């Protein structure tokens, strides 16, 4: 028998200041899975500021801790016994991958060619621990079945949304990202890859 419990709570407060409107949203997601018996608290918070000097701009910052519970293929751990025989074991000690995230963003609302547009830009950083490494053999992906690595991702996303062609919503976007990982037991001295 396998079961999961999940709960989520969120609240938003807003107020007016001399410098504009401020929205504060805080929440908590809580997950539990009987297979791993792991309790995963995920707090998150965001602050949005709409400055009084220019209503066309919105600035925001968001942060939180996020978990990704393992899928079945990730739980599979290949073990070799003393006779050289391989067997598959489902690792119930495998922890959910965890990321600490920070996002800074801004929106700008404007008109061009008589139509409304929105420009959005976000910069983000994510630190990920308890990662599970994998190998790729052609189209086959084999997971290690262990929390044996850590990593990070940083990036920038920019997007213009609106009616570039009259009557049709469309967007132009640009994204740049750098992500790296390293093994916790770096016996081959690979470093960040």
Q: Which stretches of residues belong to each language-model region?
A:
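Gram-negative outer-membrane beta-barrel transporters
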Residues: 14-19, 124-127, 144-193
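Outer-membrane beta-barrel translocator domains and adjoining extracellular loop/strand segments
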Residues: 1, 36-42, 72-78, 85-87, ...
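Membrane-embedded beta-barrel scaffold of Gram-negative outer-membrane proteins
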Residues: 93-154
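Repeated loop/turn-to-beta-strand initiation elements of outer-membrane beta-barrel proteins
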Residues: 17-24, 54-59, 112-119, 167-170
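Outer-membrane beta-barrel translocator/channel fold
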Residues: 52-102, 108-109
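Transmembrane beta-barrel strands of outer-membrane/channel proteins
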Residues: 26-30, 47, 61-65, 74, ...
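Residues that define the transmembrane beta-barrel architecture of outer-membrane proteins
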Residues: 3-5, 39-41, 98-102, 150-154, ...
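Surface-exposed extracellular loop regions of Gram-negative outer-membrane beta-barrel proteins
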Residues: 2-34, 40-48, 160-162, 166-178
């Amino acid at each position: 028998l396998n079961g999961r419990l999940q709960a989520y709570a969120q609240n938003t407060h807003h107020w007016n200041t001399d410098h504009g409107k401020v929205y504060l949203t805080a929440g908590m997601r809580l997950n539990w899975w009987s297979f791993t018996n792991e309790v995963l608290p995920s707090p998150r918070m965001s602050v949005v500021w709409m400055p009084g000097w220019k209503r066309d701009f919105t600035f925001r910052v968001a942060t939180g801790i996020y978990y990704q519970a393992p899928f079945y293929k990730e739980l599979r751990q290949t073990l070799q016994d003393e006779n050289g025989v391989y067997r598959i074991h489902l690792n119930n000690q495998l922890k959910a991958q965890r990321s600490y995230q920070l996002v800074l963003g801004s929106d700008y609302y404007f008109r061009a060619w008589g139509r409304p547009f929105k420009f959005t830009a976000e910069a983000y950083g994510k630190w990920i621990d308890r990662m599970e490494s994998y190998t790729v053999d052609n189209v086959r992906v084999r997971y290690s079945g262990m929390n044996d690595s850590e990593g990070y991702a940083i990036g920038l996303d920019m997007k213009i949304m609106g009616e570039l062609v009259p009557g049709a919503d469309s967007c132009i976007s640009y994204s740049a990202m750098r992500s790296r990982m390293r093994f916790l037991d770096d016996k081959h001295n690979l470093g960040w890859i």
